[in-house]
């Protein structure tokens, strides 16, 4: 099963890459860590593609923990790359095509703005992939998939089991450097 999942993921990545090579405009929905990073990658690898970055919150990188100076710097970089940044608005409905598939479409935001793109990516609403842990962990699994840990990162109710990184319910921005700090 894991091999087939890996093959499927590889095929989707290859399809998205091929689509990005031909896309005139790309829509990225979500301007948090993942969305901003994705836009940076797209504008670097495919400089001919126009990019629209749509964020429901009033600012990019809406998660707490970012200094205003960093947000301004990122916004300036996005502007220099020609990215159209729209904040405080959401899609009225999802595009009629799967994310990462090249197929021109039009959508409207809840504020009535019409957007056109050739492909799109969803970069919001992440949840921790903890389903593989099974039913033994259901009582300590939150709605977003994270699991309860104590101050020493021990999994609550499971002696001898620790967790680090994105699957923990530690209140922090989920980043690789935080997972490395957990491991120490």
Kindly give the residue locations of the regions a language model identified.
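Catalytic P-loop NTPase motifs of RecA-like helicase/translocase cores
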Residues: 36, 60-61, 155, 171
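Acidic donor-binding helix in nucleotide-sugar-dependent glycosyltransferases
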Residues: 37, 55, 182
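Short, electropositive alpha-helical surface patch
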Residues: 41-49, 178-184
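A Rossmann-like FAD-binding core segment of flavoenzymes
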Residues: 47-151
């Amino acid at each position: 099963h894991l091999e087939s999942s890996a093959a499927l993921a590889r095929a989707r990545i290859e399809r998205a890459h091929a689509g990005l090579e031909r896309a005139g405009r790309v829509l990225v929905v979500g301007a948090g860590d993942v969305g901003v990073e994705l836009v940076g990658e797209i504008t670097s690898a495919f400089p001919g593609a126009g990019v629209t970055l749509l964020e429901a919150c009033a600012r990019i990188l809406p998660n707490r923990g970012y200094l205003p100076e960093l947000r301004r710097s990122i916004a300036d970089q996005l502007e220099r790359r020609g990215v159209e940044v729209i904040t405080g608005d959401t899609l009225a409905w999802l595009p009629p095509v799967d994310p990462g598939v090249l197929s021109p479409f039009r959508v409207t935001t809840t504020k009535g703005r019409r957007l056109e793109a050739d492909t799109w990516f969803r970069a919001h609403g992440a949840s921790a992939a903890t389903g593989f842990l099974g039913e033994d962990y259901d009582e300590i699994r939150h709605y977003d998939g994270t699991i309860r840990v104590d101050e020493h990162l021990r999994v609550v109710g499971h002696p001898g089991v620790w967790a680090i990184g994105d699957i923990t319910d530690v209140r922090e921005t989920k980043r690789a450097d935080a997972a490395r700090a957990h491991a120490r």
